[in-house]
Amino acid sequence: MANLHWEKLMSDIIEVKDLVEVYSDGTKAVDNISFNVKEGEFFGFLGPNGAGKSTTIKILTTLLRKTSGQVTVAGHDTDTDASDIRKIIGVQSQETTVDGDLTGRENLTLQGHFQQMETSKIKKRVNELLKLVELQSAADKRARNYSGGMKKRLDLATALIHEPRLLFLDEPTTGLDPQSRTAIWTYLQKLNKEEGTTIFLTTQYLEEADKLCQRLSIIDFGKIVASGSPAELKRQVGADSIQVALENCEKDKPQAKALLKSMTEVTEVIETSEECLTVYAKNGGVLIADIVRALDSSDIRLKSVTFSSPSLDDVFMRHTGRRIRTEELVKAPSRMFGSGRR
């Protein structure tokens, strides 16, 4: 049994090679990407809105034909073996698909019939899922009366009704409050660890990818810019980051950059569109006072200085020159120094 389990973890359930997707207007939504997902893995696809995440997941779930490249799911080609793939996958899209006129139990039962499950098995599975997503008390209430978080949980349950080998989640927690988001995380971790379900998650939330995913790929403008475990990717950054915002960024940036690069503790200085400059340094926390004094002595007006330990946002910026910024972005709090606002 142990050997079989190991073989399962070592085998690829998703294989993508040189995938390209070009829309009819000429837009290249996915630009020659390659990656693999192992069976039993919790894999993340991290990137800002418009990066190509949803397009990729549509191809993987057979909803969109690729322009070129090779894509297989459980050994089946996404273009020629769509029906075989759909039997073994579950999909939760960004928008909830529950029927508000039906109760939670009725929504799940209907989905079971769509999957051509036996009636006796449907009843048992519905009860299991209602317990999993903690909707037993609301099971016989119409879904239109559910909160946003409850609808998301019901939507997740419908994707699991037929016990799929592989679950695709396209930004499943977008728009949820922190409590509901944390609850979804708990269910997903349980599915992956206790039931061995392979999970492919697209997300724009840094904390979500960091907490849940064993491995991930970061995508931007249709290209994969980095891949690895969250810990590996953060180790590649290797240093603390200090975001330096100047009152007059365009005027003072060249002088400030040269000044900061001359400091012996600094390993790298990158120009960014948000904070003006990002400084990488070992033990960056103790360097902040020196940065403030150095800029002040050169009559460079400082707006703010923000310090943080290596994060996935730093990984993204290292590869793209900017940060992942969206209204819904969730990041660990960082410490702010200075009187200015970000």
Predicted regions and their residues:
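ABC transporter nucleotide-binding domain
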Residues: 186-282
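A short, local hydrophobic-aromatic micro-motif
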Residues: 14-17, 31, 67, 267, ...
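ABC transporter nucleotide-binding domains
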Residues: 11-14, 21-226
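Hydrophobic/anchoring residues in structured secondary elements
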Residues: 21, 268-271, 305-307
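Residues at or immediately flanking beta-strands
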Residues: 70, 142, 241-243, 301-306
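C-terminal coupling/interaction segments
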Residues: 2-7, 283-342
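A generic structural signal for secondary-structure junctions
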Residues: 90, 116, 155, 238, ...
